[in-house]
Amino acid sequence: MRKISILVISVFLFLGCKQKSIVHPTFYYWKTDYQNKKEETSYLDQFKSKSLYVRIMDVDFNPDLQLPVPISPIKFSDPIPKQIDIIPVVFIVNEVFNKIDTMQTAVMADRIVKFVAAKVKQAGKQNYAELQIDCDWTKGTRNRYFKFLEQLKANPLLKGKSISVTLRLHQVKNIISSGVPPVEKAILMCYNMGNLRKYGEQNSILDQHEMDLYLKDYLERYPLSLDVALPIFEWAVVFRNGQYAGISKRIGTTQIGDKKLFKQRENSILYDLLVDYPAAGLKKGDVVRWEQISTEDLLSTSKFLSRYLSPRDRNLVFYHLDTDLLKHFTNEDVQKVIANF
């Protein structure tokens, strides 16, 4: 009986002492003009961030030129703080890989590397250790996308640097058709997982049901080392006559809380527009689904992920660095999320 008691105690001690990841919190910077704003930089200091993921540009296919071209590249009005390393991020529209062959992907890889190097210097940095490629690849584009990644790795300007990619939930579950990118690590994008265009009450930014469906039985077996990206953003999804009409960048917390403009449905995230609102291109009768993220959402998501991610050094990246978004979360809130890993 004594031996059984010791065994039971040992099991409980083992379960209670599950090894934790060493988490390095930081942010994405997704604006087109980098300014070293005191309030935003204070968040980097507050969370002892050592790096910042900075969107350098989008890449899309230009039908007139018949070439992939840079879209809205960032400019640096200020240098990035000396104590912060830059991790450049390039977003590539998936359709690009349906339009070009492997010879063109080689040219694109070379141009991206040179463009990134120039932008990193504009940011006040002489070098960088990691380049991240953001692309929601599919079964149809994976071969050319993976070839492009191989071409990047072979570029002499990237010698000694690592390449990471973004990873969506469907690419984890559908690993056979999606394949595994030929890179050192990926970052799991835990947002934009619901059906944005479907009319209804769902929060398309973060949906626990979708996470269960796509990750519960698959995440633990994913072969790459994984960092994690979590959302802290909010947006206004507009519907007209029950049909998706877009995301309005002119609707924020001030507008959605204006009772002369909107009437919130009871116990709902749907808001009816009471008058025409030309400043946002909206008409009376339009419906806005106001989607936002709470501390409780982040806590439940981080707890869920911690069950299936192996303990290791891991970047935890919040999307994105913006004072208006971060004011919804206290330092204590964020520290609790970090502690869950």
Language model region names:
Residues 15-16:
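C-terminal motif of bacterial Sec signal peptides marking the signal peptidase cleavage site
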Residues 30-32, 57, 91-93, 136-140, ...:
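Active-site beta-loop-alpha junctions enriched in small/polar residues
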